């Protein structure tokens, strides 16, 4: 029956979901019911979640006696030692160029690099900068050092393999 309707249902579904992400992944049988959605500011699949999904909210955590700190759960958790372990001799340059240190002694991406998309666009513009090309994958990785993803409706989804992050 789907073919008889010229796959109209699929076309509508994909068009609707394109409002939420630039890339969609159909995954086996789940593709008939849910689509893996990667928000437009992200590049890597680990920063996506299924749509539709029942998102978590702050009360879901509070009801389980878990203090909810949106910044802690949804922003990369980057320590000085993590930067040194990843970037070795380039850690000083990376800190100065891409990060600001916050009041807790952790590092936040500067506004101009606070999404994977912004970071990738900057690196692609720096064609002569071999140093930037080498560190791109590590910087993208640091963007995924989170526990939760916040969706457009202010719901929260666990990051894939969040238990394997340093966060």
Show the residue positions of the predicted features.
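Catalytic cores of glycan-processing enzymes that make or break glycosidic bonds
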Residues: 1-167
């Amino acid at each position: 029956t789907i073919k008889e309707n010229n796959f109209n249902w699929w076309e509508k579904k994909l068009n609707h979901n394109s409002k939420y992400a630039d890339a969609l992944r159909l995954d086996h049988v789940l593709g008939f019911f849910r689509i893996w959605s990667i928000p437009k500011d992200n590049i890597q699949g680990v920063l996506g979640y299924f749509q539709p999904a029942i998102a978590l909210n702050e009360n879901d955590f509070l009801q389980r006696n878990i203090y909810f700190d949106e910044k802690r759960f949804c922003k990369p958790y980057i320590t000085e030692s993590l930067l040194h372990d990843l970037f070795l001799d380039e850690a000083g340059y990376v800190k100065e160029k891409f990060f600001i240190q916050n009041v807790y002694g952790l590092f936040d991406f500067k506004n101009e690099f606070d999404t994977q998309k912004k970071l990738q666009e900057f690196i692609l513009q720096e064609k002569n900068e071999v140093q930037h090309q080498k560190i791109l994958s590590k910087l993208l990785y640091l963007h995924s050092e989170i526990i939760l993803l916040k969706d457009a409706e202010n719901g929260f989804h666990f990051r894939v393999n969040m238990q394997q992050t340093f966060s």
